[in-house]
């Protein structure tokens, strides 16, 4: 779901009221920097359940406390449920994997030495009893090749399921891709 920028002058948030005297161009400048938010209402808009007038958050006859995001007609839970590649289904798949994979929520965690790789890569290994997983996250907009993965890796989850990240020489991570590998201990 997307955040909806709301002018400080219409803020319901008490913190936002403290800054309502600021000119809108200054608010936009501060908000764009990403370092601070003057209006917490931006991320408190009603959940977008469907394409109806109030996004399915409340009946059409009721006015919600905050306005719905203008994009709610196309970006909502109902439309994401039907899209296998949606962020909603990505999270559901990750939660299911976490539920059935003890190493993802218990045991030890060790950060992989990536000193010879891009600073945009984060990798860590989780081990619980005899189960081990290796997580690789590419935070860059570029394809990145990694070193060879030890432990007979197999893909348990990928944010880009149509790709095969395991190559003979290591991993080939697509831009902004995350991969969970099952590996032997």
Residue ranges and their predicted role:
Residues 54-55, 161-164:
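A short acidic, often aromatic-flanked loop/helix-cap motif at beta-alpha or helix-coil junctions
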Residues 167-185:
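C-terminal beta-strand-rich structural cap/linker in extracellular carbohydrate-active enzymes
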Residues 143-161:
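Beta-strand-rich binding/interaction modules
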Residues 127-129, 149-150, 174:
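Flexible, charged surface loops at secondary-structure boundaries
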């Amino acid at each position: 779901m997307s955040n909806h920028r709301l002018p400080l002058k219409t803020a319901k948030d008490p913190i936002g009221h403290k800054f309502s005297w600021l000119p809108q161009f200054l608010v936009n400048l501060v908000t764009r920097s990403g370092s601070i938010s003057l209006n917490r209402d931006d991320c408190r808009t009603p959940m977008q359940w469907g394409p109806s007038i109030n996004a399915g958050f409340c009946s059409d006859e009721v006015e919600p406390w905050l306005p719905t995001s203008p994009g709610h007609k196309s970006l909502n839970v109902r439309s994401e449920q039907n899209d296998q590649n949606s962020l909603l289904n990505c999270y559901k798949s990750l939660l299911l994997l976490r539920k059935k994979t003890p190493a993802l929520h218990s045991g030890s965690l060790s950060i992989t030495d990536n000193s010879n790789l891009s600073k945009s890569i984060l990798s860590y290994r989780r081990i619980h009893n005899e189960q081990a997983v290796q997580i690789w996250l590419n935070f860059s907009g570029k394809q990145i090749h990694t070193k060879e993965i030890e432990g007979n890796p197999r893909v348990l989850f990928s944010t880009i399921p149509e790709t095969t990240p395991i190559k003979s020489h290591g991993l080939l991570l697509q831009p902004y891709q995350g991969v969970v590998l099952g590996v032997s201990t």
